[in-house]
Swiss-Prot record:
SUPFAM superfamilies cross-referenced by the UniProt entry: Nucleotidylyl transferase
Subunit record text: Homodimer.
The reaction(s) this protein catalyses: FMN + ATP + H(+) = FAD + diphosphate
Biological source species: Methanosarcina mazei (strain ATCC BAA-159 / DSM 3647 / Goe1 / Go1 / JCM 11833 / OCM 88)
Keywords attached to this entry: ATP-binding, FAD, Flavoprotein, FMN, Nucleotide-binding, Nucleotidyltransferase, Transferase
Keyword presence, Nucleotidyltransferase: yes
Role, per record: Catalyzes the transfer of the AMP portion of ATP to flavin mononucleotide (FMN) to produce flavin adenine dinucleotide (FAD) coenzyme.
Protein's UniProt name: FAD synthase
HAMAP family given in the database record: FAD_synth_arch
Residues reported in the UniProt entry to bind ATP: T21, F22, H26, P27, G28, H29, D104
Family from the record: Belongs to the archaeal FAD synthase family.
Amino acid sequence: MLAGYYPSPGDLLTRVLATGTFDILHPGHVYFLAQAKALGDELFVIIARDSNVTHKPKPVIPEEQRLEMVDALKAVNKAILGSEKDMFEPLREIKPDIIALGYDQRFDTEILEKELTKRGLPAKVVRIPLSKECPLCSTGTIIKEVLKRYG
């Protein structure tokens, strides 16, 4: 899955991981990923599977298309789809040093760090604050605006 993306033996790179649904990709996503990349040398992104999105409406954009769009962003070294069964599964292969959470992601940083350590993945968890306000920096806001204009 990640062949060709590991550094050579002896290289010490800081690997950052970000996760998310990234439905209807917008500037807020791009700002978040740029800030996450600034925490290290490599940025890996796990895209939530359609079947795993249960805390909000199902994505409008199918997972494969969301994966393609995020993987094409300049800040992203590699994007992959998450596991449908175990959210920690891809982390075992990526082996992140830092996990970047968005300001609105529902994880508790301390609990997540404990769960990671328990699974032999001692990554530091960092919450990225809301960095830039913009009128259409949320998927929900974009959908509401589209409905207002065309609904």
